Amino acid sequence: MKIAVIGATGFIGSYIRDEALARGHQVTAIVRHPEKVTVQNLRLTVVKADILKDKVDELVKGHDAVISAYGAGRSGGDVYSTHVKGARAIINGTKKSGIKRLLVVGGAGSLDVAPGVQLIDTMSPERITGGMLATRETLHMLRKEKELEWTFLSPAATIVAAERTGHYRVGKDQLLKNKEGESRISTQDYAVAMLDELENPQHIRERFTVAY
């Protein structure tokens, strides 16, 4: 499969890129800073681009699917506005390119922890970032989409670089916790879940979440 990975040098995007390559897919890494791509692979093409300035449809045209790990950063400027603009550009560009399949790296903040209560609602104001709010808005945008075969994957409350076990539990809109009350997943196993969904779609036009 030929996959365009937007944000392929990021905290999560880099693992999605590597997992896709390990499975034998052809990957186009669409990044702002090509020098950050240190992996070398004959099936990897690196393209320098700015999602807010370049035409997304031209960047992704000819691929079988788009995986967006786009992020506007954690600080500096209006992160919320920039992230939402980028997400909208990716959604519209994917549609314009004729590609149907779009998978999006989401956040945990929009997961339900109780009826009518999302994880982000339980956080103190100083912990809530523009990026968290923007990923929630991205989900709202996707849920209005009728044309794309989109999937939005929310991680557990805690996601860290650890190990690839190849195992995870799957949920829908509710935060998953283990017997100890912990909600966590490694970046590696998050990438496994993303590629599993791409190869064997189970959540078309849905959000799902993964955790141990």
Question: Model-derived features: where do they sit?
Answer:
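Substrate-positioning beta->alpha
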Residues: 134, 181-195, 206
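Conserved catalytic-site region of short-chain dehydrogenase/reductase
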Residues: 75, 109-114, 158-162
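Conserved beta-loop-beta element that borders a ligand/cofactor-binding pocket
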Residues: 140-161
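NAD(P)H-binding glycine-rich loop region in Rossmannoid oxidoreductase-like domains
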Residues: 35-96, 202
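Conserved beta-strand positions in the Rossmann-like core of class I SAM-dependent methyltransferases
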Residues: 4, 28, 151
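N-terminal Rossmann NAD(P)H-binding glycine-rich loop of SDR-like oxidoreductase domains
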Residues: 3-23
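Conserved Rossmann-fold NAD(P)-dependent oxidoreductase catalytic core, especially the SDR/UDP-sugar
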Residues: 26-28, 34, 88-132, 144
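Glycine/proline-rich active-site loop of Rossmann-fold NAD(P)-dependent oxidoreductases
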Residues: 145-146, 160-167, 197-206
